[in-house]
């Protein structure tokens, strides 16, 4: 007894290269953007190192604290006489440090928003401030007076006055409790060590005005950004040439950030793009486009919030949602009675094992209309049905099945222009696909064999055949050029 006819199973083809990588999926998971509008350019974004990772946004003459979970303003500090710069939250989340255009450096208590210190040792605008992550009572400031100062919070006194830059200092960062790196508009990166008499221990020339320097966690590498390029410097080798130069932006790069695992570098620029680099090979693995020139950027320590500030006052917040996986297993509590089904203090009735098992019979799937037509040897109707509503893979599967059962010529015969044109259009669309080309070439030859003498009888069919011919000629030309290229490569490698 023969087996009943089953459903037509789609053909399986070799998988094509997937243009969407796991890296793309991760960065595209930053969704649900929340856009806020400030009154002036957003010059600084800084995340707290403490959960829930609130962040400070510096814009105009105020610093606002945003909640990472609510993504709205929690506190506003507006006690500045002029434009504020570089709002920086201490690692314990209790204090805020910021400079302003008058040269004043202020420390605020975030719980009360009161001013704890107001320091005026700088004579020009202070564009960079940063608490030392290794000591709660130490912080730095960099100013347009070409100096970097290291302060003692408890006394409010300058511990070290680092001078050496020949132009504005616009960026500085801690490398350890005693070492820091700075960059300025003189195009130099300078490494300082406060333990020695002459604190400037090393300098490099970036070649353009530097907007940001970022030391890596290893302590042996510094990244600088100035103009449209990023340069990577090896401090151990001490060479004056960078180990790597990245030129993926069209305009000046204004901000850099690193993820918490120190495996990805993010850069933002005036071209409105954010680029993500894999630091193992320094290649761009993903990119994002924003509506305006980017001035500042921050990535939360848990890599769930990406915040970007722009020159037009737009603040964009993108969030990556993490689904919490809860264990379905009940924790087993040992002790007396646990072997008898008693968990904790709740008693349960012990049940014996069930020796009877019921196996449900798998339900057979119903045949689709084109399956029934194929089963009834109505080959032309089956082909028309999949051409009308089927996917390309299903149509190819039907054509291959018709070839196997010897029904292809029957399915293609006795067609008018209205039923033949959709098939020719399908051939034109997919004949260059390497997965389908072998089968579609056979179908094309069969159509020309059947209707070759009568092609001029219908304008619709003649136009469809002409377009199909153009596609075939294009593929032949590409193949010829590919063969020529192979020959050239063989000559070079011989």
UniProtKB/Swiss-Prot annotation:
GO biological process annotation, one example: positive regulation of transcription by RNA polymerase I
Localisation: Nucleus, Nucleolus
Pfam families: UTP15_C (PF09384), WD40 (PF00400)
Keywords: Nucleus, Repeat, Ribonucleoprotein, Ribosome biogenesis, rRNA processing, Transcription, WD repeat
Ranges for the WD repeats: 37-76, 79-118, 121-161, 164-202, 205-243, 248-287, 289-328
Cellular component terms per the entry's GO annotation: cytosol; mitotic spindle; nucleolus; small-subunit processome; t-UTP complex
Domain of life: Eukaryota
Main location: nucleus
Coiled coil segments of this chain: none
Function, as annotated: Involved in nucleolar processing of pre-18S ribosomal RNA. Required for optimal pre-ribosomal RNA transcription by RNA polymerase I together with a subset of U3 proteins required for transcription (t-UTPs).
Protein name: U3 small nucleolar RNA-associated protein 15
Organism listed in the record: Schizosaccharomyces pombe (strain 972 / ATCC 24843) (Fission yeast)
Gene this protein is translated from: utp15
């Amino acid at each position: 007894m023969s087996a009943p006819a089953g459903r037509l199973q789609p053909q399986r083809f070799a998988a094509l290269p997937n243009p969407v990588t796991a890296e793309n999926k991760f960065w595209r998971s930053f969704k649900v953007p929340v856009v806020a509008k400030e009154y002036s350019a957003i010059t600084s974004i800084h995340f707290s190192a403490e959960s829930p990772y609130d962040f400070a946004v510096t814009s105009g003459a105020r610093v606002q604290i945003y909640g990472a979970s609510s993504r709205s303003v929690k506190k506003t500090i507006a006690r500045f006489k002029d434009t504020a710069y570089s709002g920086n939250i201490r690692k314990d989340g209790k204090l805020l440090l910021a400079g302003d255009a008058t040269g004043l450096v202020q420390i605020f208590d975030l719980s009360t928003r009161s001013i704890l210190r107001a320091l005026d040792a700088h004579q020009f605008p202070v564009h960079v401030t940063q608490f030392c992550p290794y000591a709660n009572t130490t912080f730095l400031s960099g100013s347009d007076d070409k100096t970097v100062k290291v302060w003692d919070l408890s006394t409010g006194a300058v511990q070290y006055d680092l001078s050496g830059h020949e132009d504005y200092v616009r960026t500085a960062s801690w490398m350890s409790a005693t070492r820091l790196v700075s960059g300025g508009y003189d195009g130099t990166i300078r490494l300082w060590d406060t333990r020695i008499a002459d604190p400037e221990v090393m300098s490099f020339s970036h070649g353009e005005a530097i907007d940001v320097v970022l030391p890596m966690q290893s302590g042996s590498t510094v990244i600088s950004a100035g103009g449209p390029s990023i340069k990577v410097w090896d401090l151990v080798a001490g060479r004056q040439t960078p180990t790597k130069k990245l030129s993926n932006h069209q305009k000046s790069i204004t901000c850099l950030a690193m993820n918490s695992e120190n495996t990805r570098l993010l850069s933002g620029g005036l071209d409105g793009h954010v680029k993500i680099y894999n630091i193992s090979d320094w290649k761009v693995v993903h990119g994002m486009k924003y509506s305006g020139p980017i001035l500042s950027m921050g990535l939360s320590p848990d890599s769930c919030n990406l915040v970007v500030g722009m020159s037009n006052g737009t603040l964009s917040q993108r969030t990556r949602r993490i689904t919490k996986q809860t264990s379905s297993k009940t924790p087993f509590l040992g002790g007396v009675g646990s072997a008898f089904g008693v968990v904790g203090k709740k008693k349960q009735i012990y049940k014996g094992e069930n020796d009877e098992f019921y196996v449900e019979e798998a339900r057979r799937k119903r045949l689709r209309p084109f399956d029934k037509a194929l089963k009834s040897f109505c080959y032309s109707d089956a082909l028309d049905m999949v051409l009308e509503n089927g996917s390309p893979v299903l149509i190819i599967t039907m054509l291959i099945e018709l070839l196997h059962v010897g029904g292809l010529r029957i399915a293609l015969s006795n067609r008018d222009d209205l039923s033949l044109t959709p098939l020719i259009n399908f051939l034109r669309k997919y004949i260059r696909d390497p997965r389908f080309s072998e089968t579609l070439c056979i179908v094309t030859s069969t159509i020309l064999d059947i209707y070759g003498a009568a092609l001029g009888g219908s304008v619709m069919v003649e136009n469809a055949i002409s377009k199909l011919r153009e596609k075939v000629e294009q593929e032949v030309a590409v193949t010829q050029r590919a063969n020529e290229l192979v020959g050239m490569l063989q000559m070079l490698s011989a």
